[in-house]
Amino acid sequence: MGKVLALAIALLGAVSAEVLAQEPADESRWRVGAAFGYGIRSNPLVQSDDIPIIVDLDIAWFGDHFFFDNGDVGLTFADNETLTASLVGRFNSDRVFFGRTETRFVNIDLAGAPLAEATLFEVPDRDYAIELGIELLADGAWGQLQMTVFHDVSNTHDGYELYADYGYGWRSQRWYFEPSIGASYKSASLNNYYWGVRDDEVNDVLPSYQADSGLNAHARLMLSYQLSRQWSFSLVIEYERLNDEAAASPLVEDQDVFGYFTGFGFRFR
């Protein structure tokens, strides 16, 4: 799931969690919802725009073993009261920032030094990678834990990512509150593909750069109020700190990435 989508989908999750707890066991295999509101995810790249979020959809289908969940497809091979393990295919989310960049004439390089003449500069493009991996989900009275390991199978970056996230939710009548924290380890190949600068991309503005592996950290806070069986009003705030190797890239202007989304969530089924 893309990082931008995750903010709105987290809001919809508050609707689903409350409603699912009230529904019988023969509920529909489909989960369909929509979020209406306003949010922004900051873009850490130089010469880029923040990413707006206004309307988003939550579409998922869960079979006995196979599932589709907002772009992720998977096969669940273990499922019990405390642990679910699945084989999952997805698109890497690091590329999303590169879709909101601009081309401009600049008079200084990225280090702030003046150029002899105005130069046309654009942030190099990057491709989406198709990744395959294992996802483990565990929950209990102690909270919820998600752990994943994904590897590129599309020969895009040929790297891998290790991810872990822990959250604990409180519910009081119509209110639901859930903070979560986590980290993701990016291999050198993955980090360098998205944040490195290759020799054929070097120019008067952009110097060469090779990124090594690194560890991102993130935190999220979700607050929701259940208006009815299908409607809720929620606020989601998210923070991510890029690893030092990514932050040192000449493509990156800000190591800290902030996001928020507030609005109404509606669950169709």
PLM-predicted stretches and their roles:
Residues 226-269:
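Predominantly the C-terminal beta-signal and adjacent terminal strand-loop region
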Residues 42-55, 104-106, 110, 115-126, ...:
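Surface-exposed strand-loop-strand hairpins of Gram-negative outer-membrane beta-barrel proteins
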Residues 21-68, 73-74, 95:
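Short glycine/proline- and aromatic-enriched beta-strand/turn motifs that initiate or cap beta-hairpins
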Residues 1-29:
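Cleavable N-terminal export/targeting peptides
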Residues 36-38, 57-63, 75-77, 87, ...:
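Residues on the lipid-exposed face of transmembrane beta-strands in outer-membrane beta-barrel proteins
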Residues 26-32, 53-55, 64-66, 81-85, ...:
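Outer-envelope beta-barrel architecture signal
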Residues 39-43, 92-96, 152-154, 184-190, ...:
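Structural signature of outer-membrane beta-barrel domains
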Residues 71-167, 171, 176, 188-211:
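Outer-membrane pore/translocation modules
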